[in-house]
């Protein structure tokens, strides 16, 4: 296994944490980059970082290089979490924007299905390729996406913001009106974008960041905006996903094959329920999905905790096994509001 060994304790925590640190740093830069130089450039940078990080990680001769590769992958994550959803919403047909943005989020699970089953297949490798190959294959989906992205136009909203109105008109006409540059929908969209940009510029000239805390309404909205991202990661999904093997260890599922099999099946399950949530977003509404998600996660997490505690006290195999279906139920709740 080389320097990797069996990650645990601080070493395991560092492998996971440095990824988030890289994402945190690049998220701030990504917003500026996508607004200043276009959504596509930011996406290209994200692709470049994930390719570099994958190669660096797979070829890492020691733990220091591997940790750096994880940070590089994290930088990529911050970029591709910022610009692509913007670009997708700005080129999608108006009636399809909600479901398009939701389907973008479940792309994570599409990649997770591949990675989990590749890891399952390489579990028997006696060499360091048992983890180097899955690390290298992080570049698979970005490579597959490159040909399609070469054909993807720049955001019409960004183009209009750069006074490249005719280029934006052609993009909207090609995507929304079968190439008709004079279509009423195209004219209306351009007008709406111009008005929105103008309003934003006027607002920026007469306001400051301090305005976000000056009124009760603004403070309430700021609180929701800030805490939504925090609580989405504090809902327990990180513990169950990043440390699934350790969770399973605590309930008596200790065989590597069984743990990886559960992980692979869980990612397929996540992909299915993430898709269901995306399809239901317009029919059921966002708030009902959020509330349903929170309720399902709360109840199932309480049950998981109770069963885990009972297993620790009694060592009852059926009690430990009962945790597994509730992990799946928990993630079904998480997925529908993703």
Regions found by a protein language model. Give the residues of each.
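Alpha-helical transmembrane bundle of multi-pass membrane proteins
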Residues: 1-174, 198-338
